[in-house]
Amino acid sequence: MDASVSLLPEGESLHRSLSASQIQMLAFGGIIGTGLFLGIGSSLAESGPASLLISFSVLGVSVYCTMLALGEMSVYMPVAGSFCTYVGRYVDEALSFSLTWNYWLNDTIALASHVLATRLVVDFWLIPTEGDPVSASLSLPPWKEAVRIITPITSLSANIILNMLPVGGFGEIEYWLSSIKVFTVAAFIVNGILCNLGVNNEKKFIGFRYWKDPGAFNNGIIGVISSFVNAAFAYAGTESIALTAGEAKSPITTLPKAIRFTAHRVLLLYIISVLVVGINLPYNTPGLDGDSVRMSPFTFVFKKFGVPGAASIMNLVILSSALSAGNHSLYAGTRLLYSLAKSGHAPKVFSKCNKHGIPWLSVLATSATAILCLMSSQAGKTWGFLLNVIAVSNQISWIFIAVSSLRFRKALRVQGKTHRLYFPNWTYPVGPYIIILLNGVFLFLQGYKSLYPFRLSLFVSYYMEIPIVLGLYLIWKIYKKTKLVSSSEADLETDWKSLEDTDSA
């Protein structure tokens, strides 16, 4: 069966109800989350502030190129399956099968990580010590233990309820949740700069003091390389803006605006944020270690700022950001499972939508996996494991977005249809090769620290995604006997016509 997902009449499929502003903030909601607020803390502890800045800057270039490459294809062909569909159209249906299932699994794990993060965040109020929250919890009173259990359950329940709303209402809620996050990051940057200049508890100028003592780098070149997996986790979700293409109003105009808006602002906010964190906190700050996440580095800086209640307000925003990011992961995973069902790669029942155009069975199935992670007794270690898996999964996806982009352009050229590009990727052809090179190198090198000494759990978290993707690919390749799609035969028509009809409607 064909790997594509055609746009069906509105009553039978997803509804086009998302405006440009909602898509922009939905993208922010998926990107700005626990990866930035919590993930950079463990990266700072393991690698140092300079390594953190290098990894976010270098990988930021790759992410920017990825968003433009994907945006070019999404505007041309706005479908719910996004790059997973494009891989099937322009490369190989077996690869589409493999990547879509893997990316769906990635979104279920991402949802679990955001849900689990809420438990880590509330530890700021529940655990007064600076030690490991897991150890400290042994002496916590029953009501505090109850809060630690109820919080992630409530977060997951809220994610499910919000994803059952009509997509227009869901987009509006995400718009405001994401607006809060963007405002908070901007406020953090301003307060962090003031804190560095001397507006802090010690009333002293900090500057780059911590880049000298304890230092700018930790663990040398290994620290630099390993920091890229944390950066990849923080940038996870940048590619999922294209998943809104199937529900965007007038995608030919709304998607380019949303992609430009998101790409530039995310990179700017991220790089400045990691710099501000790196100049205000030494890498040996207690509680930043990935195995015992004490609190967000953002909360540390606000606490250092000295304003009463500022740290608690920051922590509350981080809690809401985990809810927002969970919403986005569930939204993305739901649309992928819907896409799989439409293409015949999953049971057809998952393509069933209610009267509001919500694939409600896909919502329930995607959220089910997150429940397993709620039973973990060591939230910090489990969250760190999930972080690595999600990061690697996204790097694999970015590589094949680039491959699809190259094949897409070749198909347009061979068939004489390059004039149809509404949103040309100005980084082509250099951009896709940058994506493949950078992510390909770090995909294999960043897990080096798991080898010396060898740590099985850490090794699995870095490399389990590779055999999963390869195995799924070979299973479908052998079963369906698929072949590489010829550039002269690649389908450039089906959803391009739907795009014209949609925008003229």
Swiss-Prot record:
The keyword Transmembrane applies. It is found in: Membrane. It holds the Pfam family AA_permease. Its main location: membrane. It comes from the Eukaryota. GO terms for biological process: amino acid transmembrane transport. InterPro entries: AA-permease/SLC12A_dom (IPR004841), Amino_acid_permease_CS (IPR004840), APC_YAT (IPR050524). The chain crosses the membrane at residues 25-45, 50-70, 149-169, 175-195, 221-241, 266-286, 305-325, 357-377, 383-403, 425-445, 456-476. Keywords: Amino-acid transport, Membrane, Transmembrane, Transmembrane helix, Transport. One of its GO terms (cellular component) is membrane. One of its GO terms (molecular function) is amino acid transmembrane transporter activity. Signal peptide: none annotated. PANTHER family: AMINO ACID PERMEASE, AMINO-ACID PERMEASE PB1C11.02-RELATED. Belongs to the amino acid-polyamine-organocation (APC) superfamily. This is Probable amino-acid permease PB1C11.02.
